[in-house]
Amino acid sequence: MRFSHINLSGQNSALAQRCAAKCWIKTAGAAICLLSFLLMPPAWADGVSVGKASRLRNLVPAAELEQSAVVEYEQIKKQAELKGELLPDNHAQVVRLRAIAARIIPVADRFNSRAGGWPWEVILLKSPQINAFCMPGGKIAFYTGILDTLKLTDDEAAMVMGHEIAHALREHARARIAKGQLTQLGAGILGGLLGGGHYTDALQLGGNLLSLKFSRSDETDADIVGLDLIARAAFDPRAGVTLWKKMTEANKRSPLELLSTHPAGENRVKEIEKNLPQVMPVYQAALKARQGAAMSKR
């Protein structure tokens, strides 16, 4: 079978031009997408910006400290139970606090990658103390005094919890113990050089984590990180302002031991207000997502 010769040179040229144009458009589009991706801030770049946790903390084994915290926490629970001060699981305020924690804990690993593996726990102790704490490893306790005296809203209670959790996430206790060890070791070496007596083992962790006093910089750090945590959990971070105003007023009526190492109330409020522009968009996005999830369940 014979085929007639057909001249396709013109058609081939036009086809080549169209292909080249399409390729250029695709290449340009890909370049624009790549540029947009490179210029887009990563997901972790929103919210507050804090420096790295103190490197001194590495002098203290995290696992050992967290195990010590578990032991001390269990002792606190047993003592409170014997005195009738450990409120039951079905108590309205216990249920409330655990619901708040259930929203904050899932976002905690933003500031500490090990937080997801911690055995988190929340208890409420019947006591007039205006206080709360979170031990290394996620062991949380509130005193009824802080809830009742300050009449905390859910957002304000979340701010207290976020602040205390931030101490654990940023490993402030671990760093404080490390600093104490270095001081003790230095004193021991100096005592040895001067012919002094014996000194206790500088590598011993010590027995009372609740007696540790955080520095003012630790407290400010915990405020800022706590602000970020509650915003991601869809709690209003502006509650940080109202909370510390309540704390300041309560301190005027009767000086609070809780605030003895904390920054002054006015400075604290100013620092929180300064960081609100960084966390309000995070809060609004989290709130919208939470409301959307609630609507989808109906």
Residue ranges and their predicted role:
Residues R2-C19, W24, F37-R298:
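A Zn2+-metalloprotease active-site environment signal
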Residues A28-C33:
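Sec-dependent signal peptide hydrophobic core
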